[in-house]
Structure formats: C-alpha cells, structure tokens
C-alpha cells in the first residue's frame, strides 16, 4: 500500500467513515465527519503510524480540511 492509501486508511479508521476514501475532496469538518476531539486523535494516529509529529499549535484546520489536503500536508512533513 502506498503512502497516500495508508493515510486514507488511517483517516477512515479515525473518522469511522469510508467516505474519506471515496471522496478525497470532502470537507471533513464542514460535513461533521471530524470534530476537535477527532482531530487530536487523528494527529496522534499519524504520529503512531508514520512517525510524523504535527504540533496541535501549528494545525491550521483550513489546510487540513480534506483527505487530499491531509495527504499533501503529511507529504510535506515526511
């Protein structure tokens, strides 16, 4: 599985919704798929799975609002 697919799998697991795999441009916050508690859980999951740390203080919701944006941000941090 490539990195992008792994990110989508982790995201789907945390969101408990496969729509993030089916529609990578869906706004996960606008659609209520992920809330602030879920965001913290997601960042911890990324740290655990990929050893990528995203400080919550540097988390900009507008830059992380879709699966494609999340993949882009994580690729930049790798």
Swiss-Prot record:
Classification via SUPFAM superfamilies: ACP-like
Pfam families, per the entry: PP-binding
Main localization (coarse): cytoplasm
Name recorded for this polypeptide: D-alanyl carrier protein
Keyword set, alphabetical order: Cell wall biogenesis/degradation, Cytoplasm, Phosphopantetheine, Phosphoprotein
Gene3D superfamilies: ACP-like (1.10.1200.10)
Family stated for the protein in its record: Belongs to the DltC family.
GO biological process: cell wall organization; lipoteichoic acid biosynthetic process
HAMAP family, alphabetized: DltC
Phylogenetic lineage: Bacteria, Bacillati, Bacillota, Bacilli, Bacillales
Species of origin: Bacillus licheniformis (strain ATCC 14580 / DSM 13 / JCM 2505 / CCUG 7422 / NBRC 12200 / NCIMB 9375 / NCTC 10341 / NRRL NRS-1264 / Gibson 46)
Residues modified to O-(pantetheine 4'-phosphoryl)serine: 36
MF term (GO), any: D-alanyl carrier activity
